[in-house]
Amino acid sequence: MPCPWPAPAPPCATLREALAQGQTSGTLAARDIAPGALRSLQPRTGAAKEAAAAPGQLHALITGQPLFAGDTRLPGLLYGRVLRAPVSAEITSRPRAWDAAAARADPACVAVVQHPRLAQMGSLGLGIVARTPSALDRIEAALAVQWQVDDGSAFEQAAIDERIDIDTHLRRGALQHRLRKDDLPTDTAWTLDLRMDVPLAAHAPIEPRSATAHWLADADKKGIALKVWAGTQDLFYMRDVLARQFSLAAERIEVQACRIGGGFGGRTLCTVELEAAVLAQAVGAPVKVQWSRAQEFSQGFQRPPSSHRVRARVHGGRITHWWHALASSHILFTPAVMPVWMQTLADLAGDSGVARGAQMPYDVPQQRIEFTAQRLPVHTGPWRGLGAGPNTLVVESAMDECARHAGADPLDWRLQHTTDARLAQVLRRAAADARWPERPASDATTLRGRGIVGGIYKGVSYAAAVADVEVQRTTGQVRVTALWCAHDCGLVLQPDGVRAQTEGNLVWSLGMVLHEQLPVARSGVAAASFADYPLPRMGDVPPLHVHLIDSNEPPTGAGETAMVAGAGAIANALRDATGVRFSRLPVRSADVLQALSTRA
């Protein structure tokens, strides 16, 4: 995400240089280091890769000690909530009328707070503060807020689908941005013409976000004025936003970063932290704001939906021409981080988050890859891997279809189209671990299939996955029975941590293909609980086999790499089992039954 503040590069670089030279104590003075001298961590010869210690908070986690923002306790702590109109934050809305007397009649009510800083994009909220968290629901009901909403911005799911429909955009001509623009003959005889659509999706962290704010009396106006406890992915950004909002020097705000119960890009903006700070200032006491599950769905930002069309020509046993066009919404250049005038300028450059993963990792001589990003009335932003998950799923689905047209083995087809030794290595490793030639056989009751995918994340980290699936002929129920993943992120400093990240990516991939779709209705997100947004459960998760490639290359990151492999492997296995390429996600039992019936 673009950072509007100067990054503390010299101190970080100075510290890393000192550590690399063996200095582990004492005082360092930050010094300027030329950008050209900065480099990634270089592995030392003979480094003990498996000697990493267990995470320092492991014992505290398994014994339930207070580590998360919601665990914060302070003397005199009060509890707050900011009420908002039940529509998207992209729509202008504000409280029009409320019954303050009825709310204050509750003995647990401390205050009803109106303040312009309670605005999140177009949504202006109304704050309430109570003595106990259980009283907040009661006070909210008594307040009976009536909302003023911009009627001209009403929308339903169909409006979102129409705005990003890739075929509509292609009929209008070339898309906004091109990642690769080789000339493709207008009379190209396409072997494959594939349309795929990926829906809106939520972060759905197990821990809804929380923050506690405490304003401190400071007579000399130089010390810490505001302390905030939060589960944030960027405490410096949080501090700087609060400093701007309250016209304070950044040095007068202290943000204590607590452990996060699920971030995935969703804890980057200043939301609940600002709400807590405004309410705490209004009542002159520390205030904790804890979002509900419904607020997490409706007020957090989501992975944008995307619509894709891929055309490919297969000739002489190879792909000779490739055209991938996609339409989506913004991930980095959103209203949450920049004003409207800046969004317009940013649109000229193109949102790199939308494009991530759209460039295929294989060798095809003639390619056109283009995209457009449309402003949507739903709140979109970074989701694990940004655009890499949906984009690579589509690329690898098309790659698999091309292999079928050529009558080629999917593994051999991929190896035939790459000269990248590291990509070939993870493909071969995943295939070997899964015993690729030993394909699962279908029987009278169950269809079985196997799929493989390889990918490169941000040009530096590699992953390949193999998936096995079973499909019940009579019910259409799909079960992933095994997932293998080979992962190359250079030198692995914390093997257990990398395995855990890879396993998490694979579970997200499972949800992406078979479970997750955020419903939209009445101008906003319609999910209030996990009943409305099903996630993979423990019983849905197959055995996960992760192989970390032993490498002495510099470490390149592992938090999102396997997102380029897991979903495509599952989708390709489903295609192998059923003979049907499902073009709209998620794939549910009813979709499978209908497809099998049509095919029969």
What would you call each of these model-derived segments?
Residues 1-600:
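Cofactor-binding beta-sheet edge motifs in enzyme active sites
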